[in-house]
UniProtKB/Swiss-Prot annotation:
It comes from Cereibacter sphaeroides (strain ATCC 17023 / DSM 158 / JCM 6121 / CCUG 31486 / LMG 2827 / NBRC 12203 / NCIMB 8253 / ATH 2.4.1.) (Rhodobacter sphaeroides). GO terms for molecular function: rRNA binding; structural constituent of ribosome. GO terms for cellular component: ribonucleoprotein complex; ribosome. This is Large ribosomal subunit protein bL20. The lineage of its organism: Bacteria, Pseudomonadati, Pseudomonadota, Alphaproteobacteria, Rhodobacterales. It comes from the Bacteria. CDD domains: Ribosomal_L20. Belongs to the bacterial ribosomal protein bL20 family. Gene3D superfamilies: 6.10.160.10, Ribosomal protein L20.
Length: 120
């Protein structure tokens, strides 16, 4: 029985990892073993940060909405505003509210007035 060396498969696998590690510092971009470790760690960071990005944007939207609500009425807080929106039956998500607060303050103030009226 003849010996199978599988050199092409190994070379292709190595080349794939080295290609993914392109631009990394020093041996991390050329040495297969360190490149494998670097690519694995980079993939871990990428997966973690895709999840974190969603949390970070939601926190940013909440901060922007809170700031705009306090400009509208110093007594109103973010939680009271959201409660007023739900009582008024206004279903607008936080992303849209934050965008309105930044780019169209008049429209946001109209929504805030409706929320305040629903609370009273």
């Amino acid at each position: 029985m003849s010996r199978v060396k599988s050199g092409k498969v190994t070379h292709a696998r190595h080349r794939k990892v080295i290609k993914q590690a392109k631009g990394y510092y020093a041996a991390r971009s050329t040495n297969f073993r360190t490149a494998t470790q670097a690519v694995d760690k980079a993939n871990q960071y990428a997966t973690r940060d895709r999840k974190a990005r969603k949390r970070n944007f939601r926190a940013l939207w909440i901060q922007r909405i809170n700031a705009a609500v306090r400009l509208f009425d110093i007594e109103m807080t973010y939680s009271r505003f959201i409660n007023g929106l739900s009582k008024a039956g206004i279903e607008v998500d936080r992303k849209v509210l934050a965008d309105l607060a930044v780019h169209e303050p008049e429209a946001f103030n109209a929504i805030a007035a409706q929320a305040k009226a629903a609370l009273a």
